[in-house]
């Protein structure tokens, strides 16, 4: 029997999803994800005062090696409760939240399969409603529900659909940038921007957001998803990671560098001189702009 409570990590679910690291037994399996997703469907339905069959929930993942199997477990759990399930495939955490409010989507909830910047063998689940991410107490309640669920069979796979979320989310971001700059359809023409996606899910930002707006992204690095994370630790707060984007900017003669973690909810920046802006300095810079 799965000890669901041990998988809580604050407002997320986290665990070891793959073997291969000494002393770290697998704790987050597709079967556990199945049970937790069933619980989320029931929890969300109760909060909204509807049946699980009335729900639409999106599921996305980052580039982790265990992502496809864990995401499949989540979708199967949602389907087992009768919910409609939008398969978002490779996605970012911010995009998964936006799936609950973005025009044309407006889903009831979303699940992101990610362990953020943690090592390759870890994975986890982040949950969203239209009000934002679930909080610690919500996760405790959800995991308690999971521990009491009776067995369930397979759901109706016809209620799973390909979502196309990242295309819509990328268009949304392009619109925000164009509106903010106010310079036509290619406001970034003549600007060279390097993106370091850390082999996570952030390559879309270079190829689907910046490049269509006219930016030169030729100096970008580690855009291809690879759950082994061969380039560096996928964490903008890591010294080796920041050295990677700084090198790309300086050697590429870029105007700006951007670096993301695996699920694209952490970022750092580097200016043309190699000056780093991350954590408090990035917040201070954004505050000055606002």
Label for each model-derived stretch:
Residues 1-22, 132-152, 259-261:
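Short, compositionally biased "basic patch" segments
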Residues 5, 25-32, 62, 66, ...:
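Catalytic cores of large soluble enzymes that bind and process phosphate-bearing ligands
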Residues 18, 202, 267-269:
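Conserved protein kinase catalytic core
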Residues 35-39, 95, 169-172, 241-244, ...:
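Well-ordered alpha-helical segments embedded in enzymatic catalytic cores
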Residues 42, 46, 50, 56-122, ...:
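N-terminal small/polar loop signature for handling phosphorylated ligands or for N-terminal nucleophile
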Residues 121-249:
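Gly/Ser/Thr-enriched, mixed-charge loops and adjacent short helices
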């Amino acid at each position: 029997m799965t000890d669901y409570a041990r998988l809580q990590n604050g407002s997320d679910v986290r665990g070891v999803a793959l073997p291969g690291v000494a002393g770290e037994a697998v704790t987050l399996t597709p079967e556990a994800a199945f049970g937790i997703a069933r619980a989320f469907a029931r929890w969300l339905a109760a909060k909204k005062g509807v049946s699980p069959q009335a729900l639409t929930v999106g599921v996305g993942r980052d580039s982790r090696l265990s992502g496809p199997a864990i995401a499949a477990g989540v979708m199967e759990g949602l389907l087992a409760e009768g919910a409609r399930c939008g398969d978002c495939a490779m996605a970012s955490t911010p995009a998964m939240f936006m799936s609950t409010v973005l025009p044309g989507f407006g889903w009831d909830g979303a699940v992101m399969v990610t362990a953020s910047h943690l090592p390759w063998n870890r994975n986890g689940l982040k949950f969203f409603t239209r009000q934002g991410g679930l909080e610690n107490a919500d996760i405790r309640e959800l995991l308690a529900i999971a521990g009491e669920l009776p067995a369930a069979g397979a759901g109706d796979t016809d209620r799973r659909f390909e979502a196309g979320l990242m295309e819509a989310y990328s268009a949304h971001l392009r619109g925000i940038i164009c509106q903010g700059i106010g310079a036509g359809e290619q406001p970034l023409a003549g600007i060279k921007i390097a993106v370091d996606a850390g082999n996570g899910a952030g390559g879309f930002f270079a190829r689907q957001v910046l490049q269509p707006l006219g930016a030169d992204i030729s100096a970008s690095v580690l855009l291809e998803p690879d759950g082994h994370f061969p380039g560096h630790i996928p964490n903008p707060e890591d010294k080796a990671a920041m050295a990677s984007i700084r090198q790309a900017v300086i050697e590429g003669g870029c105007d700006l560098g951007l670096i993301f973690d695996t699920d694209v909810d952490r970022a750092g920046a580097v200016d043309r001189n190699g000056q780093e802006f991350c954590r408090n300095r990035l917040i201070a810079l954004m505050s000055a702009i606002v």
